[in-house]
């Protein structure tokens, strides 16, 4: 098996946090459930939806703003309001089968919740978890961030 790529990730939502922050740092919403993973973004890449490429970091809680260089083992693709949105799955060691199941289960649930939130916010479009796509594929579909990027083109 080839060595997974390493990426720099900045933590936006520490594991256990109820505050959902966007890549620009603003609070998007307060969740009724804590985030089960450290969630952040790869500041060097823009995802297909026009925002920083998302990343989940498995393991112990990391503080808000932590910057970590870590292996991207896989990726999950979500569709949010009809836009593809890859999430790199990162950890020091290869995720266990149990962790992989938990990640996929979370994103299936998250897609349903985000769909309801988008209905309430009157933001149309399909919401779903499409499943695994691979870290290399997610990185290939992303584009390098340049100085012209100042935030996502749409509100999330």
What are these regions (language model features)?
Residues 1-156:
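Hydrophobic N-terminal alpha-helices or hydrophobic patches in metabolic proteins across all domains
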